[in-house]
């Protein structure tokens, strides 16, 4: 029990490198004011009963992310060289995203677009987006641009499975019920990621009907995606995470 207690302290300590950042269940009064509502308080009660599950989920994240970072180091090297050779720009794309309780962090992704792409168009990206580089298009086809997020998982900004981290602009558009998803760390993948893996096609269809890319995402795509993420709160478990991760692999390889 002593060893488990020490591991628990590590995993729930915000100051530790591998701490349980964002999964240290806050009380109602500790929760940020913008999140506090009927939906989040009800979900908080559910998660308070799953502390052991959340501990093992974090432990799973630490062990697997560390192992994959070692195993995939050759992939990191090859892709880094390819990205650098194409236009000489930075290897990683770092953007501010939102995770647990509205905390801002910087996500790691392999850069697949031209430099300063976020200043040249909408935040959402379509498959035929002219800002995507040649090597970037190939990287995106296998979702390899997400691989560096293993670093975010290891340090506790993210989990393998959870709501995809949004930029502040889209979090500002959350309904009260959507705030529930900020009770757990953002994730690399989720059921909604699988169901909306062709998200850009859906956005294009709405744009054909007169909406901008941002309007299509906020008004049409986001509400549907978030319902999957809200449901995840009730069923969170390591077994469920493994299932979603395997489904993600199969979806990418299709």
What label would you give each PLM region?
Residues 3, 9-13:
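Short, positively charged and aromatic/hydrophobic N-terminal segments
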Residues 22-30, 160:
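Short intracellular "coupling" helices and adjacent cytoplasmic loop segments at the cytosolic face
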Residues 12, 27-28, 32-117, 232-254:
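A hydrophobic, helix-centered structural microdomain
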Residues 28-36, 93-131, 192-224:
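Short, glycine-rich, amphipathic interfacial segments at transmembrane boundaries or analogous
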Residues 65, 80, 93, 133-137, ...:
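Positions in alpha-helical segments
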Residues 2, 16-22:
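Residue-identity detector for glycine
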Residues 23-26, 183-254:
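C-terminal terminal-structure detector
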Residues 126-192, 245:
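A short, structured surface patch at a secondary-structure boundary
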């Amino acid at each position: 029990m002593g060893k488990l207690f020490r591991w628990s302290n590590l995993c729930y300590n915000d100051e530790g490198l591998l701490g349980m950042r964002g999964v240290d269940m806050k009380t109602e009064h500790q929760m940020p004011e913008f999140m506090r509502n009927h939906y989040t308080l009800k979900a908080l009660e559910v998660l308070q009963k799953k502390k052991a599950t959340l501990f093992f989920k974090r432990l799973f994240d630490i062990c697997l992310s560390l192992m994959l970072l070692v195993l995939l180091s050759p992939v990191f090297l090859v892709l880094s060289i390819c990205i650098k050779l194409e236009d000489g720009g930075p290897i990683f794309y770092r953007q501010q995203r939102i995770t647990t309780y509205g905390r801002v962090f910087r996500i790691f992704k392999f850069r697949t677009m031209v430099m300063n792409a976020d200043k040249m168009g909408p935040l959402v990206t379509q498959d035929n987006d002219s800002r995507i580089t040649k090597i970037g298009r190939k990287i995106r086809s296998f979702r390899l641009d997400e691989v560096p997020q293993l670093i975010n998982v290891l340090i506790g900004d993210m989990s393998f499975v959870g709501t995809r981290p949004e930029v502040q602009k889209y979090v500002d558009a959350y309904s009260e019920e959507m705030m529930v998803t900020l009770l757990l760390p953002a994730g690399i993948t989720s059921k909604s990621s699988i169901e909306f893996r062709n998200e850009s096609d859906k956005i294009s269809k709405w744009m054909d009907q007169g909406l901008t890319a941002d309007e299509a995402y906020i008004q049409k795509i986001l509400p549907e995606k978030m319902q999957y993420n809200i449901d995840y709160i009730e069923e969170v478990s390591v077994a469920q995470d493994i299932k979603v991760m395997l489904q993600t692999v199969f979806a990418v390889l299709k």
